[in-house]
Amino acid sequence: MPGENIFAAAIDDLFADPSIATDGLWRAGGVDPAIPARVILRLADKVSDFGDARFVSATAVLEVRVAEMPTPSSGDTVETGGRLLIVQGEPLADALRLVWTVECRPA
């Protein structure tokens, strides 16, 4: 796809920026060997509605390059910034298949 290299280069720049991304360790199935990967961690509250009630829960969402974490799946672990996170659910890829968005929960 034309221009894909431009997007890949921009993604690489974002993940190289220490104010945006941090070093992480991915463990498939939660076991060694640990594979290094740069990750963008977002910690935010999520509001869920159930009837007339609203629930607020903490969430952890990682973004990681497909090139560094080719096959994330539920049960994998990611260690970053002193936190150990467990991947839950199926990861979502962006349109160009350059970045995974991965929902996690604390270990």
Predicted regions and their residues:
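Active-site-proximal polar cores
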Residues: 1-31
